[in-house]
């Protein structure tokens, strides 16, 4: 496996890193170049078509001024034919204010003249008096092409008299961009090949001295300190080789002088940053450092000469003979007033003959570590709250399958599909919780999608309704389809948090209400989730979105709350340009309000 060893060498790694840096640099440059080039080409194309359309608009206005709307049709047809001789123009139509097609440049569409245009973009241009554009796919005889549709209303005396509808073939722009990209890729490949060759030789000059030092290290580990590393230059590698040779020489000189005191010095030097207590063979304290005095909260004169086990309050638990046999460490409360906790390690000082000459106790302050451990356990408990809902839902479907639903050819695949979706969402949910700090730094990615909110919220309610048999769910959701743009996984987490809290704190005849209202004027909707629970004191309502805040710690822990769910929900909602707040009356229940951007879509609103 010589080739595998060569692949793992520093020389190969340097070449790989060098090549990767070049690749990354070229990718960044290529991405920047391509994006800007595409934008520039598209902008120029649209600018030319727009100027072309404005010239046609001026010509049509003159025809209307001279001949009026009744006698202008033939002249307009001639104008459109003159302006349609450009290669990128697919078709030009003129549509009057009543959406009637007056003229078209496409021979096959002449049958559409004097018929009503049903295109929503035309209707929008006529009603608003403003130009608009969009992309469509259309077949001009050679397969589907990308077509840029541009509408510009024609006005006479500030009144809209019609609309110019232009279809322009934008595919040539993308073909030109693809050709440029191919040239760039070939150039990158050639540069990469040259980079690999240069990287191999450059890495060789760096790794050769390091390889020599590695070989010398192997010899030193065998006790051979006579060899020296060859110095190739005066750079950092050369200085390192010189320092390595000096080190080898000093180790050789020090080895003979330190062997007899090695065990004692190693024990003391290794633990100097901790509390050190050294005793004689009878257990009386002879040496103690300042850290040990500080940890014990005692003066040196109150310790020297006393029994170590008595000072540590361990005389009832251990004997000196047991220390020699038991090397396990344990925690000890040294200073209850300051809450100081230390991990104590005992070791014995033994001569070569096996005679015990003393004992050493090492006190390591683990107060902060213990506090971190407590916080870690609390964090794990908090995270478990966020995982409970998907696990419960999965359990419900699995139980249904175990009870016989697997035999149903329609239900079984649906149940398995939902179970798989919940498993994947649970994994993403854990990652989101662990990356809460990324949300603070605005580095957490939001993957937005166009969502049918009615279907989205009903699906969530249905899932909770299946797992919570003792809770009544009341829905007040508009029949009109509401579309919004957000990350479905993160917003599912928000609604799961709010609904779970509503069910958890409801009392008696549990009831959770869902009210959705939209405000078309501002393109926003408000979701209200109300429970009949225990409520929140008015002076604490604004604090429930703080991280790890609990209204009643004992009650919240008993019910499994973490104090983290609503804080995460607030971060997610605000990342979607929304807002979340609460209203509550103690003893009567709590309402959580969420506002999000939205758009109500009715029939005919989509572009054809």
Curated annotation (Swiss-Prot):
**Where is coiled-coil annotated?**
none
* Membrane association type: Multi-pass membrane protein
Which residues of this UniProt protein bind Zn(2+)?
271, 274, 364, 368
Disulfide linkages recorded for this protein, renumbered to the chain, are: none
Q: Which residues form the PAS domain?
A: 261-331
Query: According to its UniProt record, how is this protein modified after translation?
Result: Autophosphorylated.
Q: Which segments cross the bilayer?
A: 14-34, 183-203
Q: Which reaction does it catalyse?
A: ATP + protein L-histidine = ADP + protein N-phospho-L-histidine
**SMART domains from the xrefs?**
HAMP, HATPase_c, HisKA, PAS
Cross-referenced InterPro entries = HAMP_dom, HATPase_C_sf, His_kinase_dom, HisK_dim/P_dom, HisK_dim/P_sf, Light-responsive_reg, PAS, PAS-assoc_C
Residue stretches making up the PAC domain: 314-378
Per the record, the GO terms for biological process are:
osmosensory signaling via phosphorelay pathway
Protein name according to UniProt: Sensor protein kinase WalK
- Please tell me the species this chain comes from: Staphylococcus aureus (strain NCTC 8325 / PS 47)
Taxonomic classification, please? Answer: Bacteria, Bacillati, Bacillota, Bacilli, Bacillales
Question: What is this protein's gene name?
Answer: walK
């Amino acid at each position: 496996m010589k080739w595998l060893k060569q692949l793992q060498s520093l020389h190969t790694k340097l070449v790989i890193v060098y090549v990767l840096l070049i690749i990354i640099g070229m990718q960044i440059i290529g991405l920047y170049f391509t994006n800007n080039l595409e934008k520039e080409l598209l902008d120029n194309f649209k600018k030319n078509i727009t100027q072309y359309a404005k010239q046609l608009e001026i010509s049509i206005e003159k025809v209307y001024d001279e001949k009026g709307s009744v006698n202008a049709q033939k002249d307009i047809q001639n104008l459109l034919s003159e302006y349609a001789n450009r290669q990128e123009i697919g078709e030009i139509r003129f549509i009057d204010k009543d959406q009637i097609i007056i003229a078209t440049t496409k021979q096959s569409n002449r049958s559409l003249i004097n018929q009503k245009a049903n295109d929503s973009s035309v209707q929008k241009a006529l009603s608003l008096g403003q130009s608009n554009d969009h992309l469509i796919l259309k077949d001009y005889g050679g397969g589907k092409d990308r077509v840029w549709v541009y509408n510009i209303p024609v006005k006479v005396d500030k009144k809209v008299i019609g609309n110019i509808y232009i279809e322009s073939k934008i595919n040539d722009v993308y073909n030109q961009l693809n050709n440029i990209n191919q040239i760039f890729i070939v150039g990158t490949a050639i540069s990469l090949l040259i980079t690999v060759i240069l990287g191999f030789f450059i890495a060789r000059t760096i790794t050769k001295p390091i390889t020599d030092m590695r070989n010398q290290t192997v010899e030193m580990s065998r006790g051979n300190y006579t060899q020296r590393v060859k110095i190739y230059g005066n750079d950092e590698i050369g200085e390192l080789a010189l320092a390595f040779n000096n080190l080898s020489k000093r180790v050789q000189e020090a080895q003979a002088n330190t062997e007899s005191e090695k065990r004692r010095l190693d024990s003391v030097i290794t633990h100097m940053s901790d509390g050190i207590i050294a005793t004689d063979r009878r257990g009386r304290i002879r040496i103690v450092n300042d850290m040990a005095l500080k940890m014990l909260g005692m003066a040196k004169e109150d310790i020297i000469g006393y029994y170590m086990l008595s000072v540590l309050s361990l005389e009832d638990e251990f004997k000196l003979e047991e220390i020699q046999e038991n090397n396990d460490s344990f925690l000890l409360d040294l200073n209850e007033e300051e809450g100081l906790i230390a991990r104590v390690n005992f070791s014995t000082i033994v001569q070569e003959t096996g005679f015990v000459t003393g004992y050493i106790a090492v006190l390591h302050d683990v107060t902060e570590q213990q506090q971190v451990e407590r916080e870690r356990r609390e964090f794990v408990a908090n995270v478990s709250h966020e995982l409970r809902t998907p696990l419960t839902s999965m359990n419900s479907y699995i139980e249904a399958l175990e009870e016989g639903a697997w035999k149903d050819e329609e239900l079984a695949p649906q149940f398995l599909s939902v179970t798989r979706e919940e498993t994947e969402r649970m994994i993403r949910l854990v990652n989101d919780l662990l990356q809460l700090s990324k949300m603070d730094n605005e580095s957490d990615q939001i993957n937005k999608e166009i969502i049918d909110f009615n279907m989205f919220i009903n699906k969530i309610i249905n899932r909770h309704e299946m797992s919570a048999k003792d809770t009544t769910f009341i829905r007040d959701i508009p029949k009109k389809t509401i579309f919004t743009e957000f990350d479905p996984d993160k917003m599912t987490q928000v609604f799961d948090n709010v609904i779970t809290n509503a069910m958890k704190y409801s009392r008696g005849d549990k009831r959770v209400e869902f009210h959705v209202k939209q405000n078309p004027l501002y393109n926003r909707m408000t979701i209200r989730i109300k429970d009949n629970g225990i409520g929140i004191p008015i002076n604490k309502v604004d604090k429930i979105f703080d991280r790890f805040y609990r209204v009643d710690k004992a009650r919240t822990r008993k019910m499994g709350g973490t104090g983290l769910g609503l804080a995460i929900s607030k971060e997610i909602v605000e990342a979607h340009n929304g807002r979340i707040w609460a209203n509550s009356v103690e003893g009567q229940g709590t309402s959580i309000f969420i506002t999000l951007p939205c758009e109500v879509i009715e029939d005919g609103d989509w572009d054809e």
